[in-house]
Amino acid sequence: MKVVTFGEIMLRLGAPDYLRLNQCNQFDISFAGAEANVAVSLANYGVKAEYITRLPKHPIADKCISELLSYRVDVSRVIRGGKRIGILYLETGSNMRSSCVYYDREDSSFATIGEHEIDWEEVLKEADWFHWTGITPALSESTYKACLRACLLYTS
């Protein structure tokens, strides 16, 4: 079985030690994205998982790709382009204070993906399942068009 996932992965900057964002002088870094998480989980279960996204050409995006590769996720068709990776800021809750997440993803590499940047016919040729979430087409007009194109090809 092979599953293709499509969506945005973001740099997650977390305030350490239950601090609030306005109290910290450094961040814990990791990466987050629903579709990437699904690909990692599937790969951990031994399912062939390919992740499709668009990331800028810089060392932070390289680190992101390395993380996915460490879980045996196929990232061979990740598109490199755009200017920035989307960012989410995390305050982990403590006691009665709940966690808070703040998103900064406007004009990210993924949000500005071109409708025809992905060769969906080739990507989906051997896919048994195509996974995306509702946020993917909601991010921008171009992610909507790219996702719609993939869905139309996958169901035909």
Where in this protein do the model-derived segments appear?
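Glycine-rich phosphate/adenosyl-contacting loop at the front of the ribokinase-like
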Residues: 1-73, 113-116
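Conserved N-terminal subdomain of the carbohydrate kinase-like
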Residues: 48-135
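A short secondary-structure junction signal
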Residues: 114-115, 141-143
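Charged helix-capping and loop-helix junction motifs
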Residues: 144-149
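Conserved small/polar residues in nucleotide/adenosyl-binding loops
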Residues: 154-155
